[in-house]
Amino acid sequence: MENILDFTLEELKEWLISKEEKAFRAKQVFDWIYNKLIFDFNNMKNIPYKTKNLLSDNFYIGVPKVVKKLMSQDKNTYKFLFEYKDGNIIESVVMKYKHGNSICVSTQVGCRMGCKFCASTLDGVIRNLTSGEILSQIMAAQKEIGERISNVVLMGSGEPLDNFENVTKFLDLVTSDTTLNIGQRHITLSTCGIVPKIKELADKNYNITLAISLHSPEDLLRKEMMPIANKYSIKELMEACDYYINKTNRRITFEYALVKGKNDSIKEAKKLSTVLKGKLCHVNLIPVNEIKENSYEKSTLKNIESFGNILKENGIETTIRREMGADINAACGQLRRSYVSK
C-alpha cells in the first residue's frame, strides 16, 4: 500500500482514471484530507462506497500517531513525538508567534552528519522520510493544536539536502493550493552545507529562505564541530552561497551557535565579518543547546551581544535567536533520544 500523502493531485487523478474512476474524486479526497483534516477514507461523506473501498485497498493516509505531546510553561511552544506506521519516531516543534504558528519539521529519522552540538545525530540515520511523511507532521500538529500553521522550518532531525528528492517534492506539495497552500516565503530550509546540493537547490529557484549552519569562520574549528567541513571548505561553501544568492536573489541566513570559549571570541567575530562582508545575508546567533554527550557550554549573553555588535559594526544584519521551549527539551533531537533510549 502507498501513502496517499506522497501523491500530488495530478498523480492521484491519473491513478483514479487508470482504475476507471472519475478524476474529480481526487479533488474531493484532497479536500477531506488537507482542509477538513479527515484521515479515514470511510469518513469522507461525498465519496461513493465503491471508491472508498478502492482507496482503502490501495492507500493509507500516513499521518503519524502522537506518542508524546509537551507544552512549555508559557504555552507558546509544543513538542511532539510522532510515530510512523513502521514504528519509527520523529519529533516536531510548534512555536506560536504574533505573526502566526511556525513548525520545525524533521526530514529524516536521525541524522548522519555528526555535528557535535546536535542530539539528533548521536545514533546516526535510520531512514529518510518521504515527502508525505514530512507533510504529515504539519497536518498532525494542526489537528492537535486546532490552529493553522503558516510557517515551516526544515530544521528538525535530519539533513534536508541529504534527502533531496523527498524534500523538494515536499516543497512542491506543501506550497500547492491543492494541499496546505503555505507560501514559499514562509519556508526556511536549514543545511549543514552540502555544496553540490545547495547549487542544485538554487537551480530549482524556490522563493524559500536558505539557512546555513556555519558555526565557525575557520576551517579547522568547523571541522572539529561539523564533519561535513572535512569535505567542503568554507571557501567552497561561500562560493555555493554566492551561486544561490545570484540565482535566486534571496538573502541567506547563517546560523551561528555560540559555544563558550570555542567560537565566541572577538577574533572569531572579526573573521566572520570578513568572510561574510558584502553578501546578501543575515546572521542568526544561537546560544548552543547543551547536551550531556559533549562538553559544549553556552556563551554568556554578554559575549553573544559583543559578538553580534562586531558583526553589526561591519554592516552585517544580525539577530540573537529567542530561546523557546527549553523547559520541554525543544532543542533538536533531545526529546526523541530520551524517549527511544528508555
From Swiss-Prot:
Active site: E91 (proton acceptor), C332 (s-methylcysteine intermediate)
Xref: Gene3D superfamilies: 1.10.150.530, Aldolase class I
EC number: 2.1.1.192
Domain Radical SAM core: 97-327
Catalytic activity: adenosine(2503) in 23S rRNA + 2 reduced [2Fe-2S]-[ferredoxin] + 2 S-adenosyl-L-methionine = 2-methyladenosine(2503) in 23S rRNA + 5'-deoxyadenosine + L-methionine + 2 oxidized [2Fe-2S]-[ferredoxin] + S-adenosyl-L-homocysteine; adenosine(37) in tRNA + 2 reduced [2Fe-2S]-[ferredoxin] + 2 S-adenosyl-L-methionine = 2-methyladenosine(37) in tRNA + 5'-deoxyadenosine + L-methionine + 2 oxidized [2Fe-2S]-[ferredoxin] + S-adenosyl-L-homocysteine
Coiled-coil intervals: none
GO CC annotation terms, alphabetical: cytoplasm
PROSITE patterns: RADICAL_SAM
Annotated S-S bridges: C104-C332
Domain of life, per lineage: Bacteria
GO terms of molecular function: 4 iron, 4 sulfur cluster binding; metal ion binding; rRNA (adenine(2503)-C2-)-methyltransferase activity; rRNA binding; tRNA (adenine(37)-C2)-methyltransferase activity; tRNA binding
Top enzyme category: transferase
Function statement: Specifically methylates position 2 of adenine 2503 in 23S rRNA and position 2 of adenine 37 in tRNAs.
Protein name as it appears in the record: Probable dual-specificity RNA methyltransferase RlmN
Classification of source organism: Bacteria, Bacillati, Bacillota, Clostridia, Eubacteriales
Gene: rlmN
